[in-house]
């Protein structure tokens, strides 16, 4: 049976309405009744500001052959790339967020703490309806050094025993995994180890329902699957 509360997250916003990771794409996704939140990517501008961008360069989406790290936040804004602060200010605290760090960005920690920080029942700093995720060990260790009690997800291609052990060693609460690498046995291994799981990136409703039925915390979706 599906666990209650499985979240449907828009992968980089709603690409059908606007370029990925743009403020317009984020707002369009959250206007869809079936959308519970967002997954988006964070990089650092040349002046240390956390911005929403997946690739190292602007070539693919913005058609601009420049690296994110060489442009200021103001310059990036000219190409429709918003800051994390702008996005969090626009969407409020209700949507769930999977914030994927592509690199260590101190500005991301500071803005998340300001906009989504809270103290849990045990008196520990945590995040309100948000997690920080990454594929890279060094980034997850960096986040743990910065904010040890914040929830972290390891992004991975499978739920193998090695991946589970790696997530546990990093102190992650869950693994966000390519849906192709998910089956009942793998999920059982993760749950037995005390880890939750999320799935990416699902593009049809049948796959969404299958992963949901296995007990996913969240499913990262695109296109028509966002509509439910």
Q: Where does each model-flagged region fall?
A:
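Phosphate-group recognition and catalysis centered on beta-loop-alpha active-site segments
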Residues: 1-228
């Amino acid at each position: 049976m599906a666990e209650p509360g499985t979240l449907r997250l828009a992968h980089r916003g709603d690409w059908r309405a606007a370029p990925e990771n743009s403020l317009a794409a984020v707002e369009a996704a959250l206007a869809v009744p079936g959308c519970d939140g967002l997954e988006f990517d964070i990089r650092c501008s040349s002046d240390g500001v956390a911005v929403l961008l997946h690739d190292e360069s602007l070539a693919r989406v913005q058609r601009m052959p420049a690296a994110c790290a060489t442009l200021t936040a103001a310059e990036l804004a000219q190409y429709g790339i918003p800051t994390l602060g702008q996005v969090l200010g626009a969407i409020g605290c209700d949507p769930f967020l999977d914030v994927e760090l592509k690199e260590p960005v101190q500005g991301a920690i500071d803005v998340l703490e300001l906009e989504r920080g809270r103290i849990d029942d045990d008196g520990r700093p945590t995040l309100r309806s948000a997690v920080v995720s990454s594929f890279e060990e060094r980034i997850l260790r960096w986040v743990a050094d910065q904010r040890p009690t914040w929830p972290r997800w390891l992004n991975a291609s499978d739920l193998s025993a090695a991946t589970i052990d790696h997530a546990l060693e990093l102190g992650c609460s869950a693994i966000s995994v390519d849906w192709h690498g998910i089956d009942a046995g793998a999920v059982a291994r993760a749950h037995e180890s005390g880890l939750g799981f999320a799935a990416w990136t699902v593009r049809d409703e049948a796959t969404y329902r299958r992963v949901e039925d296995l007990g996913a915390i969240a499913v990262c979706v695109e296109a028509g699957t966002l509509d439910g």
